[in-house]
Amino acid sequence: CGVNKNGTITSFAWTYDSAKKTFLNIHQRISNDEGKTWSQPKDLNISDQPSHPALLKDGKVVLAWVDRFKNQSIKVIVSDNLNAHFDEISEVTIFNQKKIKQNSKELGGLLADMNIWSFGLPYADVLQSGKVLVFYYAGNDKKMDLHWIRLKFE
């Protein structure tokens, strides 16, 4: 979740549909009343795991996410405000993992296949300078590290 300067809360969620045995796209919900009520989930057409959003002073929203199952990467994307569409033209890849063959498409097999979990958990936030800091973990079966990148949006 993130809270903008007006007190509006936004939530980004990644879920698994156990009936269809598939991961769903990231969905966004918004609350304008301190979390008492929420908008209907909005499908962002982005798959996999979202980060904490960076909410810039000018209203822009920067969302990082793990593209674990398609490109095995971590990406960021920007929208002009909480209600705006995230435009693919703003998408930037900040980390690429060595391609790993997935042994299963079933949830249990995916969770057991630890190779695809050797990177992730991005977290985005705004620095005092106005730049966005995104940090995440990445590595291999022998060593994990924390990585970070600072981004400037104009």
Language-model segments: residues:
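Asp-box/BNR beta-propeller blade signature and adjacent active/binding-site loops
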Residues: 1-154
